């Protein structure tokens, strides 16, 4: 093995297989683009994003790690969210939870 070498498996890899998901429609009501990263607690995103926040509590974007989704001003789009895993304790972000979900 060479340091940093990748040895991918043959075939398709399904991200977040078997994890609970929800779909929400998000509108950017602000005048600036908003970008949300793959592991950001979606419930706590920028206030300019209008969507069902309670449905998003405990969820993040269902996208590959290290990627993001950008919402342009005035844009509306539907995104799939996946449940946060592990102990489901959230600290930081915008400070709206600061503990167990």
Swiss-Prot record:
Entry GO MF terms: urease activity
GO CC, alphabetical: urease complex
One GO process term, biological-process aspect: urea catabolic process
EC class (word): hydrolase
Keywords, comma-separated and alphabetical: Cytoplasm, Hydrolase
Subcellular location: Cytoplasm
Keyword Hydrolase: yes
Domain of life: Bacteria
EC number, as in UniProt: 3.5.1.5
Subunit structure: Heterotrimer of UreA (gamma), UreB (beta) and UreC (alpha) subunits. Three heterotrimers associate to form the active enzyme.
Family: Belongs to the urease beta subunit family.
PANTHER family per record: UREASE (PTHR33569:SF1)
Protein known as: Urease subunit beta
Species annotation: Cupriavidus metallidurans (strain ATCC 43123 / DSM 2839 / NBRC 102507 / CH34)
